Regions:
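Conserved structural motif at the start of ABC-family nucleotide-binding domains
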Residues: 2, 20-23
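Conserved beta1/A-loop at the N-terminus of ABC ATPase nucleotide-binding domains
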Residues: 2-16, 62
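Conserved A-loop
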Residues: 9, 25-28
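ABC-family P-loop ATPase nucleotide-binding domains
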Residues: 10-15, 67, 72-158, 164-165
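Class I S-adenosylmethionine-dependent transferase superfamily signal
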Residues: 24, 167
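Short loop/turn elements that form and flank the Walker-type P-loop nucleotide-binding site
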Residues: 30, 64-66, 141-142, 171-173
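ABC ATPase nucleotide-binding domain signature region
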Residues: 30-35, 39-93
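Conserved catalytic loops of ABC-family nucleotide-binding domains
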Residues: 169-180
Length: 181
């Protein structure tokens, strides 16, 4: 279960404070996937970023005893001067047990299908290559909840099919928190 209590999130704008949420209370049940659907700017992605710990509310709290992924396929957090392998190793050190480190790196290397680019700096990657690496990294770890903000597959038809297969496998044991318009 994920419980949100009295959560407020706002941003400063030239015309004053814009509230995305004000005293939001919601409970997301365990074992259920939830889709947040709404117009652009409604706060769907902001809510998922806060649930995933990427953004913080102004006030209130998010309570859970479940593991929650970062947004699936998120490629914006990579360090450009490090190689794909080095970036994956950094994340794996945070989320994996020491004895799983090699396995996680090998999984992402195989999944992303970047070949020699896996050992090149990420700043040399195309956006599609970054997305493949990000998606592979997301699938390397098992979470109770996966955050899915719009894009769930990248690349050609075969790679999209591969991504869909992994999504189905993860959905057997995990729940998804999804955003769509």
């Amino acid at each position: 279960m994920i419980k949100i209590e009295n959560m407020t999130k706002s941003y400063r704008t030239p015309t004053g404070r814009h509230y995305v949420f004000k005293d939001l209370n919601i409970e997301l049940p365990s074992g259920k996937s939830v889709a947040f659907i709404g117009r652009n700017g409604a706060g769907k992605s902001t809510l998922l970023r806060m649930i995933g710990g990427i953004d913080r509310p102004d006030s209130g709290k998010i309570i859970t005893n479940k593991t929650i992924s970062w947004p699936v396929g998120l490629a914006g957090g990579f360090q450009g001067s490090l190689t794909g392998r080095e970036n994956v190793k950094f994340v794996a050190r945070l989320y994996a047990k020491p004895e799983e480190l090699k396995e996680k790196i090998e999984f992402v290397e195989e999944f992303a299908e970047l070949g020699k680019y896996f050992d090149m700096p990420i700043k040399t990657y195309s956006s599609g290559m970054r997305s493949r690496l990000g998606f592979g990294l997301s699938m390397a770890f098992k979470f109770d909840y996966y955050i899915v903000d719009e894009v769930t597959a990248v690349g050609d038809a075969r790679f999209k099919e591969k991504c869909a297969h992994y999504f189905k496998e993860r959905h057997k044991e995990s729940s998804f928190l999804m955003v769509s318009h």
